[in-house]
């Protein structure tokens, strides 16, 4: 990797990100766990999309886990990133049905377009200045959200 240790990598990544002065940092398909120092440096500006209805199925192989559990539905979540894996406040979720005979690959393929729509909808809120994280909670339009927004069939977020 060209770095003597994880701390050096996190510092270099943080410096590269800080150099472009982003309003938001989005982890989409980034399959590495971010170090605590990086997460703390950009706290409240780091978003991740995760293929499960958090807090269910943190980490990898979420589609297979949903099938093994016999879940009737599966989904995706956009959440604020905190040092603990997939544990940040959930902003919004999208759901899909689990169908008889589904394999993990089928479920992943059915969910992917909903994940894309979900991430785009949340990023619209963020870019418009409507979204914030305070004290581990999601705030939308100056109001604390006690449950995640839901993506409807038209790709709109609803309470």
Language-model-derived ranges and their functions:
Residues 1-159:
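One-carbon transfer enzymes
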